[in-house]
Each structure stands twice: as C-alpha cells, then as structure tokens.
Amino acid sequence: MYKLVLVRHGESEWNKENLFTGWTDVKLSDKGINEALEAGLLLKQEGYSFDIAFSSLLSRANDTLNIILRELGQSYISVKKTWRLNERHYGALQGLNKSETAAKYGEGKVLIWRRSYDVPPMSLDESEDRHPIKDPRYKYIPKRELPSTECLKDTVTRVIPYWTDEIAKEVLGGKKVIVAAHGNSLRALVKYLDNLSEEDVLKLNIPTGIPLVYELDKDLNPIKHYYLGDESKIKSAMESVASQGKLK
C-alpha cells in the first residue's frame, strides 16, 4: 500500500477578501500561515515524514509547503515546482470579488464559472500586464501553453499528465510524497484518482490547509482517503468553500 498526502494552501489574502485569485501570486493571510502550521503539527503528531514534495509556481502553495516541512524538520527534502500544479486560471475574473460578481451576473452564472467542468470565464487579454506571458516565472514555458482562462477540464488536461509522468512514478518507487497545491488543481487530481463524474466534482469542496491522505493499492487505485484533524472543523471548512461566490 502507498500513501499520498495532498494539501491545499492555507488561506491567502485574496481568499480572505473573497476575490478570484487564479494565477495571481498572493501571499498567505495570517490565518493561512496558522493553517499551514497546524497542518505541519498534525502530520508530525500522526508520524508522517516525506521523501519528496511537489508544488506549483505560486507563493501561497510554496509557503504552505515550506511551513509544513519546517514543522516536520524536513526542509531539506527535494521539492519539485511546476506551473502544471498552479491554480485554475480564472481569466478576466481574477481580482474581482466573488459576491459582487454574483450580484452583477447572477449566482448561477458565477457557480458555472467557478465549478462547472467545461465552461471557462471570459479570457484575459494577452496585452494585459497580469497575463502569464508577461510573468518572468513562465518565460521558459511555450506561450501557446499559457492560458488566458481555464475551465476545470483544462486544468485536468495539464495536471494529470504531470501526475502520471512525475508524481505517480515517485509514489510507485516507494517515495513518501506530499503535494501542496490549489483548490482546483487538487480537484483535478482527486477527480482522476477517484474517477469522479463531472457532476460529482462540481460538489467537491477542498478546504484550505487540511491534509488529505490517500491510501493507494499497487496500481494506485484509492483504497480510502481521509482528512486529518477534527471532523467538525473539517466540515465547517468545506462549507466555507462551498459558500464562496454567493450573494451576502
């Protein structure tokens, strides 16, 4: 049996302000820092250690991972970072308040943009400074691969090959792996691992900063999965994610 640990980054400053974040590089909030600390302590209490870690190219995921590894006394392990684990790109919605956007376009429309499988929001124009082609961290990525907007299907398309080619190989090689990423890149991975339908993934809410453990068989099929920590706290965190994008 293999174990894999997935962690969504702790609350970011834009999570706190209920803004669409996507590929915008924002820092953890004070609450997010504490969530990462708690995740590290939980993993330590449960006896977890890791051989290799994976993360995105965005600070909030990197910082969450660094805090966790520091709490475990494992800051020395190899960390592989890739844009393929970035959050879903929210196009022109990035930086907009989710509730205000719901008031303008309707909750139903915002829910479709946020949680449908194959409907992306409006594209971000390539001339804008906030487009990823203008960001030096992506200068080695072919421009044609950098999104102007994404739906979850697009995110799955970039995440799963990386899982197959990189992460899964380390798991099958006997390495203890942790992945610190984002709500939608992790939803993409969970959809694949659990073979979720498009309808079921729409209902999936991954809370910030709470370790999600997968136990996998020899073919990397899930035996079971579970969050670490207090069940009532986990439920509350999931409900908080689900409520985003609703009118206040």
UniProtKB/Swiss-Prot annotation:
Pfam families listed in its UniProt record: His_Phos_1
Record-linked SUPFAM superfamilies: Phosphoglycerate mutase-like
Keyword Cell division: no
Enzyme class: isomerase
CDD domains: HP_PGM_like
UniProt-listed Enzyme Commission number(s): 5.4.2.11
Biological processes per GO annotation: gluconeogenesis; glycolytic process
Binding residues annotated for substrate, in chain numbering: 8-15, 21-22, 60, 87-90, 98, 114-115, 183-184
Pathway given in the UniProt record: Carbohydrate degradation; glycolysis; pyruvate from D-glyceraldehyde 3-phosphate: step 3/5
PROSITE patterns to which the protein is assigned, alphabetical: PG_MUTASE
Keywords, sorted A to Z: Gluconeogenesis, Glycolysis, Isomerase
One MF annotation (Gene Ontology) recorded for this entry: phosphoglycerate mutase activity
Sites annotated Transition state stabilizer: H182
List of catalytic residues: H9 (tele-phosphohistidine intermediate), E87 (proton donor/acceptor)
Reactions listed under catalytic activity: (2R)-2-phosphoglycerate = (2R)-3-phosphoglycerate
Family, per entry: Belongs to the phosphoglycerate mutase family. BPG-dependent PGAM subfamily.
Summary of the function given for this chain in its UniProt record: Catalyzes the interconversion of 2-phosphoglycerate and 3-phosphoglycerate.
Name of the featured protein: 2,3-bisphosphoglycerate-dependent phosphoglycerate mutase
Source species of the chain: Borrelia garinii subsp. bavariensis (strain ATCC BAA-2496 / DSM 23469 / PBi) (Borreliella bavariensis)
Name of the gene encoding the protein in the UniProt record: gpmA
